[in-house]
Amino acid sequence: MVQIGIRGSLATADMWQFSYKSGMRVISIEEFHDKGWRWAAEEARKITGDGSAYLSFDIDSLDPAYAPGTGTPEPGGLTTLEAQRLIRDLGGLDFVGADLVEVSPPFDTGGITTMTAATILFELLCVLAQARVQRKPLSRG
C-alpha cells in the first residue's frame, strides 16, 4: 500500500507508525513536491509490481483551493492537475477497482469540489478501463 500526499500541521512521523509497521509506503506532501508526481507514480508502480491494485482517492489530498467541500480541509495539498497527472501516470497497472471519498456537499462552496470530484472520477474510470482492456480474458474452463 502507498499513501501519497500525507500532510498537516500535526503530521509527524510518530503519527504514521501504524502505516510504517504495516509495510505501507508513506509519501508526504513535502516529499511529493520535492520529487514530483512522476517519481511518486514510479514509487507506487515499484510497490504494486505486476499485482492487482485498488486506488482509493481521498478528495482532501487536494488543496482546499481546489476542493473546499471536505470534512478535513488542509492547506498545502495537491493541485487538480497534479492529481490528474499522477492518476494518468498510474495507467497500465492492473486496477481492479477505485473509489473517491471524503466529498462533503454541505461544505462545497459553489460546487467546486463536486466538479473536481467528477474530474478525478473520470480519470479513475479511464485507468480502470485501460486495465480491463489490458487484462487477459478470464478462462471459462
Task: Specify the residue positions occupied by each region the protein language model found.
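Short internal beta-strands
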Residues: 1-7
